[in-house]
């Protein structure tokens, strides 16, 4: 209360000595009183990927595209301590790094600043998200029949889209081979690239560089029917190749995997491969859905609902026949969704998926239909749960919804038009965690309608 009075007295004093209201509002005195969460809340961080050699004016353009707001007259600052020049790049201004980087920025509207909070090497999750963004912007590769039928009115469709006359099995297979969420940087090629001094930008490659890359790719992607003499070109010619020319040189490219690799190489300047887990998901396998009673551990105890529908993380302890190991592997903390970034911290979309797959939270959030739509039936409660997860007691739905808006320009979550508190997962949940929205909703419903079985499961887990 005293601090509030002091602020009011200071405001009156400055106005009385002739200070303009706008100057007073923009003063340091007024800024220091602003709620820190409003200006620098981690959920307000905008993640941008670009080459560190690009000028900061390029970063401004990318941020403007992400948030849909003009940032004229905004200045660049590094961690609120050093002002940066927009016509220079970060390397010229004492930030070490090379190639593609992840830049975390905050928009400070009062100060009219674009504050660079962090400059990081992209994580696997970040590269995967970037791959999704890049590939999502590409026109889908066309077959000869598609090209002839759509030459008059070309239509951009998702990468996983198939012909209407294709069978249902082929459509499902098309979804399984969708690679955009599971591309990672190939560290082995990167080391060789540094050793052989191959430029990072593919358009700077020589004939020898292209040949070396292609020989690696033939083994990595198991390319068949490829004639090395057809690929005698330099990097500029490689990057300028159309999909029609690509098809002539490589007629067989299941799932457009190698074409996608080439586009990521051209657009992002990194040599990427499909993550091993995604590679396994591309191969035919037994149906994943089993009855609730049939899913059990080595010790005979059924997994709880939440444990059944979450996949083990890569860091999970391998299960063994011992009771101690089995109990440890059943701990819910060992189960997570793919794509955890920011040093293992849970992201908002992961949190929403987590409570959507917990039958205990069906009174605050629920699935709607079978296409990934969900509704916050108690948005304030959901916000409080998110605040508890992030250790932010002041979290409310307004801040939660603002954080959700950063997903709208990607392929993760979107707002359902015309419906209050309704959102939709646009990503391929089947590829991401192994279950689609319909399967998740069914599993949650099973847990809700059979509380005795869920309670018994928990008892078995504790006893074990």
Curated annotation (Swiss-Prot):
SUPFAM superfamilies: SAM/Pointed domain, Winged helix' DNA-binding domain. Keywords: DNA-binding, Nucleus, Phosphoprotein. It comes from the Eukaryota. Residues 184-269 form the PNT domain. Residues 138-173, 281-300 are annotated as: Disordered. Residues 346-426 bind DNA. The keyword Methyltransferase does not apply. GO terms for cellular component: nucleus. It is found in: Nucleus. The modification Phosphothreonine is found at residue 157. Residues 138-157 have a biased composition (Low complexity). Belongs to the ETS family. May have a role in germline development. PANTHER family: ETS, GA-BINDING PROTEIN ALPHA CHAIN. This is DNA-binding protein Ets97D. It comes from Drosophila melanogaster (Fruit fly).
